[in-house]
């Protein structure tokens, strides 16, 4: 065994099973790439990303932990978001919530 190694049953694992999801189309209107990490509150991402922010309130990217999605300048792509879990309290990021969702 390697330190930190995970040994799972055979087959596929479904990430975030049973959690609410929403799909949004995102456009990078800026002149620089924007990278968003797996656990960043998507509602509060860089202002150069144009999308339905209210639909993203309380959601993050539905991707594996520790990974990210990069939005190139002028690029438009559709992403799936998954609801934040736990107490659903958000502090930090861009300071747009600072409390309970």
Swiss-Prot record:
Protein localization: Cytoplasm
Broad EC category: hydrolase
An example molecular function term from Gene Ontology annotations: urease activity
One Pfam assignment: Urease_beta
InterPro entries, per the entry: Urease_beta-like, Urease_betasu_sf, Urease_subunit
Keyword Cytoplasm found: yes
Biological pathway: Nitrogen metabolism; urea degradation; CO(2) and NH(3) from urea (urease route): step 1/1
Catalytic function, reaction form: urea + 2 H2O + H(+) = hydrogencarbonate + 2 NH4(+)
GO CC entries: urease complex
Keyword terms of this UniProt record: Cytoplasm, Hydrolase
EC number assigned by the record: 3.5.1.5
Biological processes annotated in GO: urea catabolic process
Self-association state and partner proteins as the record states: Heterotrimer of UreA (gamma), UreB (beta) and UreC (alpha) subunits. Three heterotrimers associate to form the active enzyme.
Family: Belongs to the urease beta subunit family.
Protein name listed in UniProt: Urease subunit beta
Organism: Paraburkholderia phymatum (strain DSM 17167 / CIP 108236 / LMG 21445 / STM815)
Biological classification of the source: Bacteria, Pseudomonadati, Pseudomonadota, Betaproteobacteria, Burkholderiales
């Amino acid at each position: 065994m390697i330190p930190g190694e995970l040994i799972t049953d055979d087959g596929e694992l479904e990430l975030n099973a049973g959690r609410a999801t929403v799909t949004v189309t995102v456009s990078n209107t800026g002149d620089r790439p924007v990278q968003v990490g797996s656990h960043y509150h998507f509602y509060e991402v860089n202002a150069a990303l144009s999308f339905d922010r209210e639909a993203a309130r309380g959601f993050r990217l539905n991707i594996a932990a520790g990974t990210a999605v990069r939005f190139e300048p002028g690029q438009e792509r559709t992403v799936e978001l998954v609801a934040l879990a736990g107490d659903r309290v958000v502090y930090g990021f861009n300071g747009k919530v600072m409390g309970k969702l």
